[in-house]
Regions:
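Acyl-donor-binding surface of acyltransferase catalytic domains
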Residues: 66-70, 81-150, 156
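Conserved donor-binding loop and adjoining core beta-sheet/short helix segment
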Residues: 6-12, 19-105, 109-110
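Short, surface-exposed, charge-dense and proline/glycine-enriched linear segments
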Residues: 35, 56-66, 135-139, 159-167
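Short, surface-exposed recognition loops or helix-turn segments adjacent to catalytic cores
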Residues: 131-134, 180-184
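Hydrophobic transmembrane signal anchors and adjacent membrane-proximal interface regions, especially
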Residues: 37, 119, 181-185
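Broad hydrophobic/π-residue packing in well-ordered secondary structure
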Residues: 4, 50-53, 83, 118, ...
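Short amphipathic alpha-helix that is part of the acyltransferase structural core
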Residues: 1-35, 145-182
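Low-complexity, flexible helical/coil segments
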Residues: 38-43, 101, 140-144, 166-168
Length: 185
């Protein structure tokens, strides 16, 4: 396993290939979009990378961000689907914990049971869920007629703020009770 502050062009390509293979297999990217952008176009100077290679191929990757002095270090990792269950994820996460200590945030993307099992095996606790929702714009139906007594207007700060915050808090409580997301040790 290599711990690097910067990836070479070849390593960068191999990591992106791993992410593409995993995305194709799982149906969802294994890491966040901002990390993909860091990989493609250069990231923060404080980013570091852990690589596990076999047969000239990256089979495990961890992106480590230690810049958040309040919430603590954050890691996202990906293991080639062909090597899941072979200890690659466990080795990566063990090494990250050696580097960062136990105050660590781990992001898990999607519903891959193996990722959630790995987090649980290290006693991470799920603390947040992020949902991405979308709707095709090609099948939008016309809006129903609106009762003339109903007034539709823009948000008015100072007038609508309390009601909006109350509704927003109610929705966030519902969202937080759902699956998949971020874990903490």
């Amino acid at each position: 396993m290599q711990h690097l502050d910067h990836l070479s062009d070849t390593q960068q390509s191999l990591v992106l290939e791993l992410i593409n293979r995993t995305t194709h297999h799982d149906g969802t990217p294994p890491i966040a979009e901002h990390i993909l952008l860091h990989l493609r176009y250069g990231g923060d100077k404080a980013d570091s990378h852990l690589l596990v290679e076999k047969d000239n191929q990256v089979i495990g990757y961890a992106h480590l961000d230690q810049t958040d002095l309040v919430a603590g270090p954050c890691v996202e990792l990906v293991v080639d689907p062909s090597y899941r269950g072979a200890g690659v994820g466990k080795a990566l996460l063990s090494e990250v914990i050696k580097i960062c200590g136990k105050s660590l945030r781990l992001w898990v993307h999607g519903e891959a049971e193996v990722a959630h099992s790995l987090a649980a095996s290290f006693n991470f606790e799920k603390i947040r869920t992020v949902l991405q929702m979308s709707k095709s714009l090609s099948d939008i139906q016309p809006l129903p007629a609106i009762d003339k007594e109903i007034i539709i207007r823009s948000f008015l700060p100072g007038i609508d703020s309390d009601d909006w915050l109350q509704l927003n808090n109610k929705v966030l409580k519902i969202i937080q009770s759902r699956a998949a997301g971020r874990y903490l040790i």
